[in-house]
């Protein structure tokens, strides 16, 4: 039996959210916000295409839902688990929401802002720097994304 890491269950839930994005023909990225005890506060997936919203990234959707659920925009004590390394917008949202920990699956060498292209969350000029855990179930996240983009390329879409 394969040993699992401490973030695997939450990442599997994020992957389920990514599947929901895929079903809506959106880029399959999913996110989960956990409170300090590990309880799920909110989930989200990409809605950029379905809602015609440039800010409809899984991380932003989940952070908004978590803030609404908690009645507080400061998400101190929370962990954001997301299937893909956040972009600059989403990394900025993590910092601004005061999330304690960011856990992500696959690295994004085209848009990643948590170490790949930029490192927004570790920038010492900012007032908050969350802990980062990278590469959790990265192969599963990558396979989902690769399949999506291969289908879109072969169909001549986006």
Where do the protein language model's features map onto the residues?
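Short beta-strand scaffold segments in enzyme catalytic cores
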Residues: 29-38
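Short, flexible loop/turn motifs enriched in small residues
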Residues: 24-28
């Amino acid at each position: 039996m394969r040993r699992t890491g401490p973030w695997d269950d939450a990442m599997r839930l994020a992957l389920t959210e990514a599947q929901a994005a895929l079903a809506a023909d959106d880029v399959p990225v999913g996110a989960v916000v956990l409170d300090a005890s590990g309880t799920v506060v909110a989930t989200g997936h990409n809605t950029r295409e379905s809602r015609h919203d440039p800010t409809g990234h899984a991380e932003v959707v989940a952070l908004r839902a978590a803030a609404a659920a908690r009645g507080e925009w400061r998400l101190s004590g929370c962990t954001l688990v997301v299937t893909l390394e956040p972009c600059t917008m989403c990394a900025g949202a993590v910092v601004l929401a005061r999330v304690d920990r960011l856990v992500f699956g696959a690295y994004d060498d085209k848009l990643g802002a948590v170490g790949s292209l930029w490192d927004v969350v570790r920038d010492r000029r900012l007032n908050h720097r969350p802990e980062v855990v990278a590469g959790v179930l990265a192969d599963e996240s990558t396979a989902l994304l690769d399949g999506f983009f291969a289908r879109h390329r072969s169909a001549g879409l986006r």
